[in-house]
Amino acid sequence: MSEMRRWTMSTGLAVLLLIGLLGSSPILAAEGKLKIGITQIVEHPALDAAKQGFIDELAAFGYDESKVVYDMQNAQGDFATAQAIAEKFVSGSVDLILAIATPTAQATANVTQTIPILITAVTDPVAAGLVESIERPGTNVTGTSDLTPVAKQLELLKAIRPETKRVGVLYNPGEANSVVQLELARDAAGELGLALVEIPVDNSSSVYQSAQSAVGRVDALYVPTDNTVVSALESVIIVAENAKLPLIVGETDSVRRGAMATISIDYYSLGRQTARMALQILEKNADPASMPIEYLENVELVLNLGAAKRMGVELPTELVAEASQIFD
């Protein structure tokens, strides 16, 4: 595998014999341990869950701390830092990189075109410029998408509060993943008779002010899987509760934190699925360029009864009965 750490043995013949037997397996990393770099754009529970799922699934297949050295880094929301992290991974000759969320995936792909990159929590890898197509990436990048059912999330809002007409969408226009979801929301809104009020957010420190600007202009709030907004979700929740605005979100953990509801995927399961793709590379020398991007098939209805009450909403009993998870 290219860009692996160089190592030496007592004789050149032994080196040649081992290469002949083991090919380019990453298990040949120094000290007999695999080096995996993990980078994520910001710390929030959904991304943390994806990371933990990846680590746990590899451990379940024998790649535990006795065989793997992880270098785990967080860019704290800064793209330049994400790129510096990727450069550190390359100079440190990691064998494989897990890039969590679109900005870190883009930064990492900018730095290396040879080290295998597994992505997860990336909404649209094609739109992000990471792969040539979903079916055949054509690059050193493959992995899993966290594209959530945006239309179903807005349908859920209408099912909970049919009189809703105007929905405020909080998103960072600098995140390609959020732009894709906004386009999907626009398409769905027209069919549902909803008008979207688009509220751009530049950074996490401006989330509260942006959410507050929606009060009096919208009937509900919607937060897609936007890393900037989700990292400061509590600010949106405060506004939603004070203004009695239903808050629909793009993923499960945001409901646990205090949003009202979602129909979404489970990020821990997404991380585990990504790890199984990594195993194909580690054990079978699979080429990321020919490994299709994968999606989680199952979605779940998640409700927060306490949040709904604080936002002045009475959830329909039939929805409560159908929920896969309920928080209070």
Model-identified regions with their sequence ranges:
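Short hydrophobic alpha-helices and adjacent helix-cap/hinge residues
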Residues: 2-328
